[in-house]
From Swiss-Prot:
Protein name: 3-methyl-2-oxobutanoate hydroxymethyltransferase
Gene name of the encoded protein: panB
Keyword set includes Cytoplasm: yes
Keyword set, alphabetical order: Cytoplasm, Magnesium, Metal-binding, Pantothenate biosynthesis, Transferase
Primary localization class, coarse: cytoplasm
Binding site for 3-methyl-2-oxobutanoate: 53-54, 92, 120
InterPro entries named among the record's database cross-references: Pantoate_hydroxy_MeTrfase, Pyrv/PenolPyrv_kinase-like_dom, Pyrv_kinase-like_dom_sf
One GO MF term attached to the UniProt entry: magnesium ion binding
Function as written in the Swiss-Prot or TrEMBL entry: Catalyzes the reversible reaction in which hydroxymethyl group from 5,10-methylenetetrahydrofolate is transferred onto alpha-ketoisovalerate to form ketopantoate.
Pathway field: Cofactor biosynthesis; (R)-pantothenate biosynthesis; (R)-pantoate from 3-methyl-2-oxobutanoate: step 1/2
Location relative to the cell: Cytoplasm
GO CC term (a single one): cytoplasm
CDD domains reported for this sequence: KPHMT-like
Length: 273
């Protein structure tokens, strides 16, 4: 299944994302785990599709992302890749699959063969040698810093990161180490907006925020969160884009527009130090 796209639409590459960042054009990113939503996101102009290990929560009903396996990620990547025509496709390396550089490379090869254009991994400056190892072997990397859900038990829960001077300094080191190792995107989750803005200015590569303020180069949300599939309490950084819309397509287009014009995230969706 796919949608008939405008033939003038160009494939989104890492080079194009860098050009968007340099020009100050915001990048819209959303999750997808199946071909139907992948096709719709691509049709609506989402530049980056993330096959996140959040599928453990969204698709499997897990409380954390820890039970997700490499086989799960490869399967859902294949589903998304079949329908995606122009978006850059990023897939998470799941918990326990990148403990060493060699393990990370073997896992990344599996995901790239399934259709990913880039892999995402969670960690700080200690992970720089692994990122460098992957990049040297032609595996593009998105580095995920700040709140890293695979470390939920080590953190003692889902908590905003970088609120103290020491924590903020560590996140700056993490971001710089990831860029120096060759990461071509740095994703920041649950980071005070001012700090995320400072890091964005400090780096030359694009930054993507989720609960990290409006000054990042782009934004990402879990699709099912932003179309309000699940009733009840949402994370602070989530906005219900179904408000005022009658279709999911309308909600996705509203999200893309809000990211592009800078109206999302608003102050109510961000954290302070």
């Amino acid at each position: 299944m796919s949608y008939l796209l405008d033939p003038s639409r160009k494939t989104v590459t890492i080079t194009r994302l860098q050009a968007m960042r340099d020009a100050g054009e915001k990048i819209a990113m959303l999750t997808a785990y199946d071909s139907s939503f992948a096709a719709l996101l691509d049709y609506c102009g989402v530049e980056v599709i993330l096959v996140g290990d959040s599928l453990g929560n969204v698709m499997q009903g897990q409380q954390t992302t820890l039970p997700v396996t490499l086989e799960h990620m490869a399967y859902h990547t294949e589903c998304v890749a079949r329908a995606n025509q122009t978006a850059l496709l990023v897939t998470d390396l799941p918990f326990g699959t990148y403990g060493t550089p060699e393990m990370a490379f073997a896992s990344a090869v599996t995901l790239m063969r399934a259709g990913a254009h880039m892999v995402k991994l969670e960690g700080g400056d200690w992970l720089a040698p692994t990122v460098k190892f992957l990049v040297e072997r032609s595996i593009p990397v998105c580095a995920h810093i700040g709140l890293t859900p695979q470390s939920v038990h080590a953190f003692g829960g889902f908590k905003v990161q970088g609120k103290t001077d020491e924590g903020a300094a560590q996140l700056r080191r993490d971001a710089q180490a990831m860029e120096a190792a060759g990461a071509q995107i740095v994703l920041m989750e649950a980071v005070p907006a001012t700090l995320a803005g400072e890091i964005t200015q400090m780096l030359k590569v694009p930054t993507i925020g989720i609960g990290a303020g409006a000054d990042c180069s782009g934004q990402v949300l879990v699709l099912q969160d932003m179309i309000n599939v699940y009733p009840g309490r949402k994370a602070k950084f989530v906005r219900n884009f179904m408000d005022g819309q009658t279709t999911i397509e309308g909600a996705i287009r509203a999200y893309v527009a809000a990211v592009k014009d800078g109206s999302f995230p608003a102050a109510e969706h961000t954290f302070s130090a």
